[in-house]
């Protein structure tokens, strides 16, 4: 079995999509985040893979009430992902995938392709155009995988790939996708522009 971990935040205005706030305001940025979160959940459900949410903090939002979830553990993103992989791999014997909630180009097929790739690789990445990644998956997790990464920079994908090679992972990368962080990113998604215009 392969399981998907979805890293998510409560969709509170002011705490999500913060790079959009100067351009569209906190309330509209939160609506964009909620749209992306709902899209991500639908994609994962349609993939047929088991999944679990990992929340940054407790939240009673209706989106999370019917979903199995855990709280993220650790001080930085690397530690939180490491602990989430540990939790997922306790029950997912064939591997685990972790995604965020800001990639509207991600499809069920991308998840299925990533899951299949773990049959003959120990680590899979879906790079993002901004230099990060939309998905990371592995069959085993090493503490050094996320060591010394410059998070929120265009170096994250390359640094993770290099760490994986040093740790002797068999690595594969799939199609590069766009994620949504800035107003320029929104312009590629008419549905998000319509959402902003109507709210």
What would you call each of these model-derived segments?
Residues 159-199:
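Conserved alpha/beta core of the MobA/IspD/sugar-nucleotide pyrophosphorylase nucleotidyltransferase superfamily
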């Amino acid at each position: 079995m392969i399981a998907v971990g979805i890293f998510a935040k409560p969709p509170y205005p002011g705490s999500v999509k913060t790079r959009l706030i100067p351009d569209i305001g906190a309330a509209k940025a939160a609506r964009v985040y909620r749209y992306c979160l709902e899209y991500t959940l639908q994609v994962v459900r349609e993939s047929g893979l088991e999944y679990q949410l990992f929340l940054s903090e407790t939240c009673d939002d209706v989106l999370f009430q019917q979903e199995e979830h855990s709280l993220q553990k650790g001080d930085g993103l690397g530690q939180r992902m490491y602990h989430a992989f540990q939790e997922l791999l306790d029950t997912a014997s064939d591997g685990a995938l972790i995604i965020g909630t800001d990639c509207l180009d991600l499809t069920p097929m991308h998840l299925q392709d990533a899951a299949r790739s773990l049959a003959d690789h120990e680590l899979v990445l879906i790079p993002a155009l901004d230099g990060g990644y939309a998905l990371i998956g592995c069959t085993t997790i090493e503490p050094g995988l996320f060591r010394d990464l410059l998070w929120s920079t265009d170096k994250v994908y390359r640094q993770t790939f290099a760490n994986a090679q040093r740790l002797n992972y068999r690595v594969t990368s799939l199609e590069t996708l766009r994620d949504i962080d800035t107003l320029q990113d929104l312009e590629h998604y008419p549905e998000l522009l319509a959402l902003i215009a109507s709210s």
